[in-house]
C-alpha cells in the first residue's frame, strides 16, 4: 500500500502508473502546439531521458532544433538531472525586489490580507480536540511557532515558490502563443513571439527561457539548458524538501516524540546531495540502496541468539560491488542512523525519493530485459510436480473451508487406501499432517470446470480510459504514412472500444483458449516506468486492444473467482483487512510463548522477467481447468513469444513492417521473447509464488503467515518447541534450534526457487525477529512505526494529474494530509501544514491560477452569482470580500458547495457517513475558540446556507448526503458533462448496441426519470440511490464516468475548447465564493447540528430526506475524565498506568481499536448470489435484499425494486428475496450510502489505544438491545480514544484515568423510524429496458452458475423441501436456538460477536441453553461425528456463564466449576462437562436451515428423536455418512430398515436474533447470602516454637475451596463488624469480589470497595462494566479501581482480600489470608487473629500489620495449631446452605488445585469415579489446548489436585508422603487412566506411586491442534508442583 495512494492496492498503483505514462506524447500533428494539454505538466510524470533518447522523439527533436536556432544551445550546454536538482534545491537565487520573479510574486502575495487569520484558525482547530493545549495555544503562539519554523526553512520556501511559478507559467504557454502575448502584468515575465518562449527574470544574472519541452537558463555569463522534465523533477524535489523540512522543524518546536530533527534531516539529505554531486547520474545506484540500508540498520538490532546473521542486509548493502564507488556515502548514512531509534529510522526511510530520479538508460533497460529473457529455464521436474500437487492441496482445502464441499474433480485411479481419495469421496476435511496423508496421491486427482465466465462480461466490463498499443496493421500504417508510432485514436482504449464489434468475453476467451489470438493483435509496446531510482530503465507494457482485453479479463477472473481461495495473497484486501493482517503477522514476533516467530522478506531477481511457460504450467493449466479452458492461462507465455515487442515511448528507430507492424531489428523491437512482462499476469504469477513458498514451509513443519502481492512476499514462520527461562528469554538450546531452523529454511528458499528458475537475491532475502515491512509499512516488535514524511512531502497543490482547479488543488492537499495522518500519531502538526497549504492555494488561485490565467489576466472577479429566496442575484465583489474567500478555502466543506478542505475530525477518522453534520458540528465547536470577533463572524457564516432556485434531483440521488446549495458547477463536473454530451451525440461509435445505450444520456429524458424517482412525499434517498444505480441510467452514466482523462475528452470533443469551458466555470466559482456570504443566507443553523443538517436537507430539496443524517460525536458527546471510578451513563474508556511518550513506544494489554466495517447481518439468497456474478445484474440483484428488509414484499416500493431486475433480465425475481424471518440488522446502520460496506476506521497510528480498554455497554441509555438510533458508534469510540490518547501522550506522570463520552446534546440522538411506504413510494411505473442489447440485457438461459452456486442452490431447494415449520414466535424458544448457536460456535462453524453473546446472556436461561448444546455435543460424540466436527473453542460458553445466576444454575445442574475469573477478563470454567455422556437428556432438537451445517443439524436432530437410532450400529453408520455428503435429496431415510424415525424434526428458517432479541431482558441478578450467622469474636493467637526454615503446614492448609469458603466468609464478616474499616481492597478475582459483596449485603453495609485490577483483557468487550452491572445497586455505586484511588485510601483503616498469585502488595494494614495466601504473611511483621469458632475445616486468618511486632509467620503457624485443636461446629454448618447450592461467588472453585471435589478414595467405585472425572478434565484440555505452555500448566493443575487428593485420603501423613518423588508422565492422546498406589508392593514403580495415562496409539505423539507435533513429558515431584512458580 502506497501512502501517496492509501486506498489503492499495489496492482491498482501499477495500473495508475501505466495510465500516467500512457497519455504521454500521444499527439504528434503539426498543430500540436496549438492544442492545449489537458492536464498540464505540473510535476514529473515520466522517466527522465538522456539527450540521445529524447532527440529520437520527433516532437522533442523539433523543439530542440528550434532552441538551437534561437538560443544557440548545444549538447555540451545541457544540464544533467543532478545539476538541475542542485540548482533548484540549493542554488536558486532569491531576489525579493519588484521586477524579478520572486519579488513580483511576493508583492502580490503580501497584498492579500488576512494572513493572520490562519494563526487564529490553527489554534482554534487544535483546541477542538486537544484539551491539553487550551492554555498556551493562542494565535500569537501559533504565529511565533510558524515564524520560527519558517525562518529555518526560508530558502526552501522561496525556491519552492519560484519553481512552482516557473512550472505554472510554462503551462500557460500554449494558450498565450495563440494570443501572442503574456497575460501577466509582471515586469519579470515576458512572452517572446519570435522564439515562442516565456522569458522570466529571476535575478540580474539569472534569466529563464521556457518553452514546451526545453528550458534555457542564462546564469551569469553561462547559457545552460535542460529538458522540461528535468525542471519538473527539480521543482518536485524542492517542494518535497520544503514540506519535510517545515514538518520536521515544526515537530521539533512541538516536541513530538521520536521525530527526525531538522538538523538530522538536513544531514541525511546532505549525504545524498554530496553523493549526486560527486557521482552524477551514477549516484542514483547509491541512492537506490538507501531503503535497503535503513531496513538493514533496524534488522541489525535483532536478537543475535536467534537470527543467524542479523547484519546480513546492512553488510551486503554496504559491500555490494555496485556500490563500491559510493560506499563512503552509505557509511555516512549508516553512521547518522546509529543513534536513532527504529521509529526515527522508519521516518527517514520515507525520504528515498527526496533526491529525485536519474536519467534512465532506455537501451540498457531493454538489453537487461532481453538478457534475462534469454536465459533458458530448465526447472527440476520434481519441483514442478510438487508445485502442481501443492496447488491442488491448497485450493481443495481452502475451497472446502469456504463452501463445505470440494470443487468438482475427477479421480482417475481411485485408491481405497488413499487418505486423500477417501476424504474427497466422503467430503471429509483434509488434514495434511496425519500420518496416512500421501502427497503423490494428488497426481490422480484432476480439477474440472468449477467457474463460469459471466455472460455479461463484454467490452463495457473492461471499458476504461487507459492507454493501449496499436495493432500491427495500425502501427505499420502510422509508421508508413507519418513516420511516427503515435496516434490518439490508436492509443486510447476508450476510443478503440467505440469502433469495436460486440465482444462477449465468454466466447472471446473460449476462442483464445482454442485458437489463440490473431497475429495482428500480438503486439506489446514497452516504455520506461517513471519515479524509479534505477538507471537502467524498468519497462512497463502496453498491449493491443484485444491482447489487453485478454489479460485484463483473465486477471479479473482470477481476482473475482480464485484469489479468495488463497488468503495469503493480499492484492484484493480492503484497507482495514490489510491493516489487521499486518498487525497480526507482525505481532506474532512478540508472543513470548513456547514458540518464536521470525519474518522473512523475499527479494526476487527480476521476478516478472524470470517467468516462463514451463515454470507456470503446473499452476496455469489447473487454473484454466477451473474455467473449463485448459489453455486459457497456459497460453500466456505463448502469446508473449509470438508477439512483436517494441519501444512505444518514441525514442527508438523503428521501421514499418507489413507483417510485424514494426520491423524486428533486435534493438528497439524484437520477437520470440517468452519471458513475463511487468504487470501483465501479476495475479497468476503471485499464485504460483505463494504455492511454492507454502510447499517449502511444509517441508520444515513450521506455521507460516504469508502476505504476498507480486514479487513483494513477506512471510512469518513460527518455530515451536521453544523453552524460555524465568524472565521469558529463550534458553540457549532453544536459540540454537531456532537458528538451525532459520538457516535450513533460508537455504531451502534459495535453493528451491533457484531450481525452479525464479532466483532470489541471497544477499537481500533477509530475516528478522522484530522488523516487519510490507508495501512501505514498517512494524517493529509488533508496533507500526511512525513514518509520515513520505506523504507529507507530497502535500502541495500541484501534486497530481488532475486539472488544476481550485477545488482539485485543495483536494490534493487534503489527500496528502489524510495519507500522512495514517502514519502519524496525532493531527496537531498536520493542522499547521494543511492550513498554510490551503491558504497558499487560495492565494495562488487569485494571482496565478493555473487554469484561468491561460485565458484572462489574473484579477479579482467583479461579481459573483448567488441565490437568495429562490432567485439568482449578481453580487458585486471587491477586495473587502477576501476574508470570507480565504476562510472558505481553509475551512470550507464540499458538501456545502465550498472547496473540499479537511477538518481535524475528518483527518483522524475514515468512514463517518454524514459530511454535513461533520462540518456543521466542527464549525460550531471551533467558533468557540476563535479569538478575533471578525473572523468568528466570518466562520459563523460557513454553516449558513442558501438554496438553489432549481431542484436537480439527479444530484441528490447520485450523492444522498448532498444538499441543494447555490454553488455553480465546476471542475470535474464539467468534464463529466462533456463526456456525456459526446457519447450522446457521437458518430464515432459504430457499434449499434453501444449507440443505443448512449441514447439514455439525453438530459431531458434522464431528468424526467430522476423527477419521477423523487416524486414521493418523502425521499428514502439511500434506496433511491441504489435504484438509480441499478437502472440503465446508472449503468450508462458509469460508462461515461470512465472517460475521465482530459486528453481523451479533448480528443472526443474536437469542436469544443475544453479548457476554456473549464476556465469559465472556475472563474464563476471563485466569484461565487467571494460573494457567497455578503448577503444574509436563506437558512441559518440551530443549536444542534443534527437538526440543522436535517433542516438544510429537507428545505433545500423541498421534501423530507430520510436516513442520511447522523450526529457527529464532536457535538453529540462531551468528553470528560476522572482519576476516580465514577460510572456515568456514557461510553467509558479506562487507561492503564502508562503516560507521556511511553504510550507511543510500548504495547499495552488492551485490545487495539482498529475500527470496523459494518456488514450486513444476512446473506442474499443462493440464486441471488449466483446471478450477482453478472456485471449487468450485480447492482439490481443486490438491491433485491431490500425487499422484506426495508420494504415488505408486495408493497408498491418492493415492486419498483423488483422492476430494476425485470428491466435487465427475464429471470423470476421471487427467488431473490429473503423472508422477513431470515433478515436481521437495521437497514440504516448496516447498509452504506453507496450500498457498500460502511463503518469507521481510525486514521492515525493506533498502537496507543492498546493502553486503553473501552466499552459502549456502559452507555445504558443507548446500549445493545435497545432502540434503533442514529448513532455511529465507531466514530464515538474513535473520538473518545483519540482525545484520551493524545492527552495522556502529552502529559507524563499521569495516574490511571477513566474517560467518558457522555451525551451532551439532547437533540442529536433520535430513534430511527421505519419509512412509511405510502409517503416514500415514488410514482415510477416503468424503467428503461433494452431487450436484445447484450450490453444492457441478459436472458436467464445465458446465466451459467459456478459449481458452488449450483450446489448451494440445490441444497437450498432441498432445505426448502425439508422445512415443515413456519415461525409463529412460539414453536422454537430462545433457549433452543441459543443451544444450537452455542454448539455451532463450539465446533467453529459459526462466528458470533462477543457483544451478541452478552445480549444472549441477559435474556435466556443459561442452563437450559447449555443442555441443548450438550445434547448435541454428546450425540455427535456417540455417533462418531466428533472427529469431523471437533470442539474448536469454548470461549462462548465461558462468556455465557459470566453471571452469578448462570453459573449457579449450571453448577447445580452440570457440576460446572469456575477455574478462574477476574473483573476485567471474565471467567474461565471447567469444560470437562463437554465430555460427560451421562448428561444427555431426552429432548427434541430443532434445525435452522438459515445457519450452517444443515446436514449435521439434521443428523443430530434425528439422533435425538430416537433412542433406537442411538444404539443401532447400522443407523449410526447411515447418520454418520449424512453430514459429509454434498446433497441431501438422496437421503430421505435416516434409519436402517428395521427402525423407523419418529415424527420429523422441527425445521425452520429464521435469523437467530429474531428469536433471542425478542426475549424480555432479565434485570434481576441477585447475590445469594447463604451464611446469615452472626459475626464471631476474633482472637489473637500465640507464637509457636517452630523454625521458619522448616515450618510445614498441615493438611487442611490444602483443603478444597468448599471447606475454605465458609470460614473465609465468616472471617471477613467478623472483621468488618469488629474493626473500624473505611476501605476494602479486593484482588481482581470474581469469586473474591462477589464474596465481599455478599458479606456487605449480609451486613447491610456500604463500604468503598477498590478492585486491584492487574491489566486489560484484550477482548472486544469490557468485562469490568458488564460484571459491575451484576452486583447489587448499593454495592455497585461504591466500587472503584484501586490504582486510580490509592492516594485516597487510609492504610490503617483498610483491609485487603488477596488472591494467591498477587505479587504486588497494596496499602492496607489489615489482610485477610486464606489457603495459599499464607505465603504473603511470611515476611510481614504483625499479629494474627482468628475467629473464636469455626464454620468449616478451611483456614482463614486476619493479619494486622504492626511494624513493631516480629514476623507473623510464627503466629500463622500457631493459628494452624489452634485450628487443629478446635472442634468443627457441625451443627452450625448443617444449619445453613452448603456450598454446592451457592452461586458462583460461593459455590465454584477458583483453581483446580483447590476445586476438584473428589469422592473419597476408600472404595474401588470411588476410585473409578475419580479416574473418570480426571480423564474428562484432561480430555477437555486436549480438545482446546491453546499453546503448549498453557496446556502443560492446565495439566499440572489437574494432576496436582489428583495427587494431593490421593495423599490426603490414602495416607495418614500428607507431608511425609509428599517428601517422596511422585512422577507424572503424559504421552499422546488419552484413552485410559490407571492409578497405582500400593505402599506395600515390592514393585518400585508401584511403591513410588506413579500415575499412568495410557496413550491411544502405540508410540504416537500427542498432537496439539495447529501446532508442530511434539511429545510433552511432565516429570515433577509434588513439592515442585506445590512450591514452584505459579502461572495461571
UniProtKB/Swiss-Prot annotation:
Keywords: ATP-binding, Host cytoplasm, Hydrolase, Methyltransferase, mRNA capping, mRNA processing, Multifunctional enzyme, Nucleotide-binding, Nucleotidyltransferase, RNA-directed RNA polymerase, S-adenosyl-L-methionine, Transferase, Viral RNA replication, Virion
Pfam families the UniProt entry points to: Mononeg_mRNAcap (PF14318), Mononeg_RNA_pol (PF00946)
Reaction(s) the record says it catalyses: RNA(n) + a ribonucleoside 5'-triphosphate = RNA(n+1) + diphosphate; a 5'-end (5'-triphosphoguanosine)-adenylyl-adenylyl-cytidylyl-adenosine in mRNA + 2 S-adenosyl-L-methionine = a 5'-end (N(7)-methyl 5'-triphosphoguanosine)-(2'-O-methyladenylyl)-adenylyl-cytidylyl-adenosine in mRNA + 2 S-adenosyl-L-homocysteine + H(+); a 5'-end (5'-triphosphoguanosine)-adenylyl-adenylyl-cytidylyl-adenosine in mRNA + S-adenosyl-L-methionine = a 5'-end (5'-triphosphoguanosine)-(2'-O-methyladenylyl)-adenylyl-cytidylyl-adenosine in mRNA + S-adenosyl-L-homocysteine + H(+); a 5'-end triphospho-adenylyl-adenylyl-cytidylyl-adenosine in mRNA + GDP + H(+) = a 5'-end (5'-triphosphoguanosine)-adenylyl-adenylyl-cytidylyl-adenosine in mRNA + diphosphate
Location in or out of the cell: Virion; Host cytoplasm
UniProt key word Methyltransferase: yes
Domain RdRp catalytic, chain residue ranges per copy: 596-782
GO molecular function, one term: ATP binding
Main location: virion
EC number: 2.7.7.48, 3.6.1.-, 2.7.7.88, 2.1.1.375
Keyword Lyase: no
GO cellular component: host cell cytoplasm; virion component
Assembly and binders: May form homodimer. Interacts with the P protein.
Family: Belongs to the rhabdoviridae protein L family.
Function (record text): RNA-directed RNA polymerase that catalyzes the transcription of viral mRNAs, their capping and polyadenylation. The template is composed of the viral RNA tightly encapsidated by the nucleoprotein (N). The viral polymerase binds to the genomic RNA at the 3' leader promoter, and transcribes subsequently all viral mRNAs with a decreasing efficiency. The first gene is the most transcribed, and the last the least transcribed. The viral phosphoprotein acts as a processivity factor. Capping is concomitant with initiation of mRNA transcription. RNA-directed RNA polymerase that catalyzes the replication of viral genomic RNA. The template is composed of the viral RNA tightly encapsidated by the nucleoprotein (N). The replicase mode is dependent on intracellular N protein concentration. In this mode, the polymerase replicates the whole viral genome without recognizing transcriptional signals, and the replicated genome is not caped or polyadenylated.
Name of the molecule in the record: RNA-directed RNA polymerase L
